[in-house]
Design a protein with these regions (language model features):
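N-terminal non-catalytic structural scaffold regions of very large proteins
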Residues: 1-233, 237-397, 407, 421, ...
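Short glycine/proline-enriched turns and hinge-like loops at secondary-structure junctions
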Residues: 422, 439-443
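Active-site lining segments that contact anionic ligands and/or coordinate catalytic metals
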Residues: 425-428, 485
């Protein structure tokens, strides 16, 4: 609103000058029943405002999106400004990229006592938890926070319905060697007298340990266990879809069944207490533990960049918005209960008048302004997620957009997470990192790195089955252990098995190059497993495809690119260039220059200097410098005097 009482659209530069937040209103359509009357508010006139969402500059809903240089100048914006930041109370704020260990993936590592351990961080829209399978004294144990102690693996498998010892051995891998390794674990279950599924559930019921009053997204607390032993579970787990309704008092076996269905390995679906998919997953984890005991080379490296995911501003704001929206609903429910309980109401009660628009607005603003991200449901409590955009120079602002923040403690003097990994080649800048305690923990993206977003899984699932993947319910353990067969994983979920994994991966890649699949879908086969990934947060980069020793991109293509008759997206659509993530790079042979291309080469680098970031890329002849000198210049180059932006004097 101007001085003359006229209104006009808000621009980012207005927000900078007036110390206000650049945000867009969130409108919803509302439909609810009042007595026997259906109240509907929708459309442009009837929609209801529930809050305001801070907008990222140059995003699709920003007024600057798609604007020409002339329009940007009229709006007081610099045409070279990259965007990608928020304006909160007049201050420019950047949400730093957050580095996380990948979810729903099996990671093999040594635990604190030196034992081989397979761990999975299960993450769903409801909860996040970690499950471990550990080898200790020749036996396998499952460990989870909801179970009091380490539980013998065979008891867990029996509770899931795998009662027969022969079935367990065949699912883990078959063969006399596997039977010999599993014998102590099977014997341990027999010693405690667990032979049937019901006995296993009763035994596990005494070990269930869930907090009392765990409501909302956690397991249902409507049926507390009898107060007999203190180790008994205090709350029941959330039953999967199609499960029988909860009773007032529940047996320990029911609690154990619900915990196995909805809490342990929560990302593996269980429908109507059919545990077959979860049994296969647990057995796959056990098989990897046994294989790693025999061959330590099969252990995973936690610092390997294929096991990392990057969280961007959209995911972080989405988590926060979901939490605030649930809080708004809870406040609205309480306000409606209070209003309807009044005996002296004069007119019809309108619940929409109780909606508070400041709950979501203030929650998002406070998080962006302070940098404190708190989501209780996922036990997330992070500090310093946002920082004030550095405007020392144009290059310092640009470099801050590509900064990656690790969750590792800066004070710990550990070299592993700080070291430069070979898997970071082409994905992260090898030079641009701060000196001192944050060295190696704060990193920067390389010039051509792309961070993926989530893609729909269902088309990939159908395609995998069409290309010969056999569904899990149709397979026995002997078929899974057949020579050459491989389990097919889609984003951490077991789809089934394929008899020719290398051929399956090649067909998927051919479809991706033909444009039938998303360009960021990744597929790679390794040691009896084939992984398809379409989840968000993976780092990938473009490479030129090489066929029979000849690069697909020719001089004619480059001339068309210079003449602007072809764009970069055309190279992707025509199958000349493709994006590879870190895992798929392991299946490729990449040449640095055309002179290095041989018959076995699969890809060619677009340009070797693209391994550097946006700041290190400005250093002249960096390969003639001692490496610490490049790191020092990355810090000092951001402090150079120069024009910050074209609009710095407005």
């Amino acid at each position: 609103v101007e001085e003359d009482a006229c209104t006009r659209p808000l621009t980012p530069h207005d927000c900078r000058l007036r110390d206000c937040t650049y945000a867009a209103p969130i409108y919803v359509d509302v439909e609810y029943t009042r007595g026997k009357e259906l109240v509907v508010r929708r459309g442009h006139s009837g929609r209801v405002l529930i809050g305001r969402l801070p907008l990222m500059l140059r995003s699709s809903h920003c007024v600057l999106a798609g604007a020409s240089e002339e329009q940007l100048a009229r709006l007081g914006e610099c045409p070279l400004d990259p965007g990608g930041y928020f304006i909160v109370k007049g201050t420019e704020k950047v949400v730093l990229i957050q580095e996380q260990l990948s979810k729903n993936r099996i990671i093999l590592d040594l635990d604190a006592k030196g034992a081989v351990c397979a761990s999975v961080t299960s993450s769903t829209h409801e909860r996040k938890s970690k499950t471990h399978i550990t080898a200790r004294a020749g036996r396998l144990y499952l460990r989870h926070n909801s179970l009091g102690d380490d539980v013998p693996l065979c008891i867990v498998l029996r509770a899931m319905g795998a009662v027969c010892d022969q079935e367990i051995v065949s699912l883990v891998g078959g063969g006399a060697n596997v039977a010999h390794l599993l014998a102590p674990s099977i014997q341990e279950a027999a010693v405690v007298g667990v032979h049937t599924q019901q006995q296993a559930l009763d035994w596990l019921g005494a070990k269930v340990r869930l907090p009392r009053g765990n409501s909302g997204s956690g397991p249902s607390s409507s049926g507390a266990a009898p107060p007999a032993p203190p180790a008994a579970g205090a709350a029941a787990g959330a039953a999967p879809a199609g499960a029988p309704p909860t009773r007032a008092r529940r047996s320990r076996a029911d609690e154990a069944r619900d915990v196995l269905a909805g809490v342990v390995l929560a990302h593996v679906p269980v429908d109507r207490y059919d545990f077959s998919a979860k049994v296969q997953y647990v057995c796959a984890m056990a098989a990897r533990v046994l294989a790693a005991q025999a061959d330590p080379a099969q252990l995973d490296d936690k610092d390997y960049y294929g096991n990392k995911r990057l969280e961007l501003a959209g995911q972080l704001l989405g988590l926060l918005f979901e939490d605030l929206f649930k809080r708004l609903n809870a406040e609205l429910r309480r306000a409606a209960d209070t209003g309807l309980s009044r005996a002296n109401r004069a007119g019809a009660f309108d619940v929409l008048k109780c909606i508070r628009t400041d709950t979501i607005t203030n929650g998002l603003e406070h998080a962006l302004a302070s940098g404190n991200w708190t989501v209780k449901r996922f036990r997330m409590d992070r500090k310093g997620v946002t920082q004030v955009l550095s405007r020392l120079s144009f290059i310092s602002a640009l470099g801050m957009m590509t900064r990656i923040n690790s969750q590792f403690e800066k004070t710990r003097k550990v070299s592993g997470p700080r070291a430069l990994q070979p898997s970071q080649w082409g994905m992260l800048c090898p030079s641009d990192t701060p000196e001192g305690e944050a060295c190696g923990l704060v990193k920067n993206l390389a010039l051509m790195t792309h961070v993926t977003t989530d893609e729909e899984e269902e088309p990939l699932r159908r395609l995998a089955f069409a290309l010969g993947t056999e569904p899990l319910p149709l397979l026995a353990g002997a078929q899974l252990g057949a020579t050459g067969a491989a389990l097919v994983f889609l984003n951490g979920h077991v789809l089934g098995a394929h008899r020719w994994p290398a051929r399956f991966a090649e067909r998927l890649r051919a479809l991706r190059r033909a444009g039938r699949l998303g360009e960021f879908v990744s597929v790679h086969a390794v040691a009896g497993r084939c992984y398809i990934a379409s989840d968000g947060g993976r780092v990938c980069r473009p490479l030129i495809i090489v066929r029979d020793g000849t690069p697909a991109v020719t001089d004619a293509h480059l001339a068309a690119l210079r003449a602007k008759t072809l764009a970069f997206v055309d190279f992707i659509e025509r199958g000349l260039v493709e994006y590879l993530d870190v895992n798929e790079e392991n299946d490729s042979l990449i040449a640095l220059t055309p002179a290095h291309v041989t018959r076995s080469t699969t890809h060619l680098e677009i340009e070797p200097f693209t391994i550097l970031g946006v700041v290190a890329g400005l250093i002249p002849y960096p390969h003639h410098n001692q490496s610490p000198r490049n790191t020092y210049q990355c810090a000092m180059g951001k402090q150079a005097m120069g024009a910050v932006a074209f609009n710095q004097n407005i």
